[in-house]
């Protein structure tokens, strides 16, 4: 639907911000308490002993002394509630209680001491600081309390989604856990979707293939979480990328046995129906619905050796079975063709985790942690199943039991020097198997002419194969902390490798039109790939310097990344001889210097108003997959198409096995059944051969200093404590990308193409109602073997890619644990690659080469988030709700071309396969906005030291039905809904804390 720019949406956004609103979200593994100590005359006091104590500290107390400016800084404090005592001979002792500390937050605690004796103690219970006047970073924290009270599925992405500036991509809107926990991307302020990073205690747990997003393989055991933090902006020199860092901080055991048991269940009969008559009329006969959702998560911890060795461990089994919209079970997998029943297909996904964390306090100065998580995962359908692919054509994906093994050490050598180190190993095996009922001899079938609402793919899958990746990473740092300076230096090092295969049945797949054979694809099996990330290393040094009311955060980071393609030996296959491929080194070999700078001004000196500014250079994430384009196996001709069709006017009467119809080992045209069927010559004679790479990198973009894709991020913000426990935040963020590349086919020039136009049908659904000529289209005059070169777009003038955005947040943590918070983000990413459109040797996709397709300026669209939790103390009942209002999906119109459509202007048939052309410029049409409100009520039942908390939750409270995905193929069914928001459903749960 065309974009509507109205004031109404903005007014609604502000209303939600004020009256409903994400919060309790305030990275790092630990926090800090810092401040200045003065006497009652205002003079600073050096030499004051400052002690921070909390049950969260295994050693119970952490001690520092104020410096010559009266400043102190206590670092490496685990999340929890702290008391801070200030003592100096000749002065009364002051004890400040009730300081709530979250990871990555610096609580500013200033104190005045009056003359007296140490024995005199003045206890102050004030409001906990909520404005960080020292760090420029924007942090959000999902504490244990927040995770337990809000109506969510306990997936860390669900908590990230409640942060106003964060956008979840890669999946549809998740209603109460109805979207299976699979690979998900978190985006903030125009960051790359694949850059988001998931860590446990600051160390990545992604598989070796992911750069952060699409984190297949490891799924977090929520019961072990003390809190989860999300860092979104103004990252210091410790961080490689400017993205969302999701950091999982596990619980630690203590001298007291404690734990919890959580359970949750939702069934198919607990869901309403939100499919409208209009959506049914548009062809959506059924929606996605839940079949069952469950989560079982007991955990417990305590001492093994009191005051020395502790453990905290747990088990979790959770999953989702959903029906797939418009997708119905096949009556017989073994039949050549798809025969739907009236029973909807299910998408079963489940995970299992057994995790334990061991903590050793070897002595007062040395603490060790060992974290291990053994997991098993099952995906019983396609990752994102739709009716277009029958379930038989989806592999069963299984993770062979795999694990995370992580160790860490910390040592506060003195009250000024802190040493830390750690390492993580994450082997992952993730394979695609044939599902029961699909035989090894069955072919993968495709029919692009299938009627609307019917699958285009059935039979077997072409996605079978083996995937193994190993990722290891290490970190070490040293921090030197005085009252005025906090200096930190260290490094992070990552290695990764992958081996994966492609194993389609019969080394062939078939295409039909109805029941008539059309073409087939042969595969050069076995197909396998080996790549290695030799190292991704960052070395950093930074300082946080407090001077008067200013805090300067400055640092520099050196990034080094090197990947290679390993030597590969592939045995002979049905169509190919044995092959050997030499190693390919330094693809890429990048080196970067990345400066970071930020400043915080405590505007009035009272710790309640902070004006902040920051700017930094960040590299774009990469892993071994960066080497894939340089892999000679990738550039080999691994698939080839040939016609497989009966002569004109002949009805096919074979068994749909092309091996019986033709000699597929003969590359020339041939048949075994003259007059009945004919196989054409293979379209590429180089099929299965070791060939020169058709895509190469300009050495200038893969080797050297400062050639890695990067982005600069700048931000200015202000945070103000309005009243105690209530703060407001506003920010402007700008991100601009650098070292963007372009691809040139060096074997073609403009003279090798013919320009043509196509008539756009008159259609009120199209921009301006259609009925015009779309020009700027080109078809190559002859088949030309590509010789692609990837080079810096700056060589031809550059591609512009810039994000601008505004954030407005309110956070309130009121008395009696009332949470009321929310935020609005307005942003857009502008891209101009018009430098590519006039040179036809430059890759541009199949979009028209006109200004409205290359200069993309979408509108600002508000993203609104809110949450509230309100305990009713008289009945020990808690009410909570969350709200999200998100922009609808961007729409496109992929218009299938034919010689009949393009021929009159082109003057000849297409040289190759007719393309699909997008006839709606990007950023001009969007679907319906998505509104989602979730609600929970819980009741605490207390008996002795045990609290039993049953819950009742309702998701999509108002049963909204916005369309989440549309049919994007232009035609009569264009814009018909394929998936709508999950209908309202409810679940029951219980949590027992002991």
Predicted segments — roles?
Residues 258, 288-378, 400-423, 595:
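Transmembrane beta-barrel wall of Gram-negative outer-membrane proteins
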Residues 2-143:
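Periplasm-facing N-terminal accessory domains of Gram-negative outer-membrane beta-barrel systems
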Residues 67, 91-252, 271, 278-285, ...:
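Periplasmic N-terminal accessory/gating domains of Gram-negative outer-membrane beta-barrel systems
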Residues 621, 725, 739, 746, ...:
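C-terminal beta-signal and adjacent terminal beta-strands/loops
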Residues 156, 166-169, 567-594, 598-794, ...:
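Solvent-exposed loop/turn elements at secondary-structure boundaries
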Residues 126, 261-267, 313-317, 370-374, ...:
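Transmembrane beta-barrel strands of outer-membrane/channel proteins
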Residues 561, 729-892:
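Gram-negative outer-membrane beta-barrel transporters
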């Amino acid at each position: 639907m065309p974009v509507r720019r109205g004031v109404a949406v903005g007014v609604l956004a502000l209303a939600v911000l004020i009256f409903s609103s994400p919060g309790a979200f305030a990275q790092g593994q630990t926090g800090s308490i810092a401040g200045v100590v003065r006497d009652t005359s205002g003079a600073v006091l050096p030499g004051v002993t400052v002690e921070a104590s909390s049950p969260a500290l295994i050693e119970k107390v952490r001690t520092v002394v104020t410096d010559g400016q009266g400043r102190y800084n206590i670092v490496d404090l685990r999340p929890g509630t702290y008391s801070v005592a200030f003592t100096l001979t000749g002065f009364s002792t002051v004890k400040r209680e009730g300081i709530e500390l979250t990871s990555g937050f610096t609580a500013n605690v200033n104190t005045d001491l009056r003359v007296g004796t140490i024995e005199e103690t003045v206890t102050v219970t004030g409001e906990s600081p909520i404005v960080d006047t020292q760090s420029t970073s924007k942090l959000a924290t999902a504490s244990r309390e927040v995770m337990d009270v809000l109506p969510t599925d306990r997936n860390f992405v669900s908590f990230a989604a409640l942060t106003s500036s964060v956008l979840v991509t890669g999946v549809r809107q998740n209603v109460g856990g109805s979207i299976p926990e699979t690979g998900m991307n978190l985006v903030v302020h125009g960051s790359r979707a694949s850059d988001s990073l998931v860590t446990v205690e600051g160390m990545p747990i992604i598989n070796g293939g992911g750069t952060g997003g699409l984190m297949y393989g490891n799924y977090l055991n929520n019961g072990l979480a003390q809190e989860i933090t999300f860092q979104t902006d103004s990252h210091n020199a410790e961080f490689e990328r400017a993205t969302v860092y999701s950091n999982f901080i596990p619980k630690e055991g203590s001298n007291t046995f404690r734990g919890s048991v959580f359970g949750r269940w939702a069934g198919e009969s607990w869901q309403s129906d939100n499919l409208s008559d209009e959506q049914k009329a548009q062809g959506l006969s059924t929606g996605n619905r839940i079949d069952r959702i469950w989560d079982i998560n007991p955990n417990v911890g305590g001492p093994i050796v009191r005051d020395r060795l502790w453990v905290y461990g747990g088990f979790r089994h959770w999953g989702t079975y959903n029906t797939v919209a418009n997708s119905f079970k096949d009556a017989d997998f073994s039949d050549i063709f798809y025969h739907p029943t009236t029973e909807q297909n299910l998408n079963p996904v489940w995970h299992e985790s057994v995790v334990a964390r061991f903590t050793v306090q070897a002595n007062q100065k040395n603490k060790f942690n060992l974290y291990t998580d053994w997991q098993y995962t099952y995906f019983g359908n396609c990752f994102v199943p739709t009716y277009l692919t029958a379930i038989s054509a989806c592999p069963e994906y299984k993770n062979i039991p795999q694990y995370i093994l992580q160790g860490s050490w910390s040592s506060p050598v003195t009250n000024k020097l802190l040493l830390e180190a750690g390492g993580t190993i994450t082997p992952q095996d993730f394979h695609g198997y044939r599902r029961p009922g699909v035989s090894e001899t069955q072919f993968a079938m495709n029919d692009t002419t299938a009627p609307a609402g019917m699958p285009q793919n059935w039979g077997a899958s072409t996605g079978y194969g083996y995937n193994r990746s190993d990722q290891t990473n290490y970190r070490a740092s040293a921090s030197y902390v005085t009252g005025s300076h906090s200096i930190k230096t260290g490094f992070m090092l990552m290695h990764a490798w992958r081996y994966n295969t492609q194993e389609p049945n019969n080394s062939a797949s078939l295409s039909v039109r109805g029941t008539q054979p059309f073409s087939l694809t042969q595969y050069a099996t076995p197909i396998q790939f080996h790549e290695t990330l030799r190292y991704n290393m960052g070395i950093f040094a930074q300082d946080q310097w407090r001077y008067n009311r200013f805090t300067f955060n400055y640092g520099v980071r050196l990034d080094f990344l090197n990947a290679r393609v390993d030597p590969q030996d592939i045995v002979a296959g049905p169509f190919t001889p044995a092959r050997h491929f030499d190693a390919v080194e330094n693809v890429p070999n990048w080196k970067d210097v990345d400066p970071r700078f930020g400043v915080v001004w405590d505007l009035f000196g009272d710790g309640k108003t902070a004006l902040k500014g920051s700017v930094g250079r960040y590299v774009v994430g990469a892993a071994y997959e960066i080497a894939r384009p340089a892999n000679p196996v990738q550039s080999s001709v691994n698939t080839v198409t040939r016609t497989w069709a009966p002569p004109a006017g002949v009805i096919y009467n074979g068994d749909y096995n092309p091996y019986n119809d033709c000699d597929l080992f003969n590359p020339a045209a041939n048949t075994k059944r003259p007059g009945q069927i004919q196989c054409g010559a293979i379209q590429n004679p180089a099929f299965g051969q070791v060939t020169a790479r058709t895509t190469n990198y300009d050495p200038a973009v893969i080797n050297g200093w400062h050639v890695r894709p990067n982005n600069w991020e700048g931000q200015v913000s202000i945070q103000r404590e309005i009243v105690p426990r209530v703060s407001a935040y506003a920010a402007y963020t700008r991100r601009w990308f650098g070292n963007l590349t372009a691809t040139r086919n060096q074997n073609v020039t403009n003279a090798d193409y013919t320009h043509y136009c196509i008539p756009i049908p008159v259609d009120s659904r199209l921009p301006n109602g259609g009925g015009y000529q779309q020009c700027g289209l080109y078809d190559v005059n002859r088949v030309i073997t590509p010789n692609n070169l990837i080079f810096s777009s700056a060589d031809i003038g550059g591609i512009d890619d810039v994000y601008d955005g505004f954030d407005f947040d309110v956070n309130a943590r009121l008395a009696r644990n009332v949470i009321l918070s929310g935020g609005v983000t307005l942003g857009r990413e502008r891209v101009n690659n018009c430098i590519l459109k006039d040179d036809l040797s430059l890759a541009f996709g199949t979009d028209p080469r006109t200004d409205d397709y290359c200069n993309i300026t979408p509108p600002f669209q508000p993203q609104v988030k809110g949450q509230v939790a309100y305990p009713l103390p008289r009945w020990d009942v808690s009410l909570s709700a969350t709200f999200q209002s998100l922009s609808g999906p961007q729409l496109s119109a992929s218009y299938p071309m034919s010689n009949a459509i393009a021929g009159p202007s082109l003057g000849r048939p297409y040289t190759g396969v007719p393309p699909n052309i997008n006839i709606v410029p990007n950023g001009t049409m969007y679907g319906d906005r998505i509104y989602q409100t979730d609600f929970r009520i819980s009741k605490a039942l207390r008996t002795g030291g045990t609290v039993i908390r049953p819950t009742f939750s309702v998701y999509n409270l108002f049963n909204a039905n916005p369309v989440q995905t549309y049919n994007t193929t232009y035609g009569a069914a264009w814009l018909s809904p394929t998936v709508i928001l999950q209908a309202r459903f409810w679940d029951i749960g219980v949590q027992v804390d002991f």
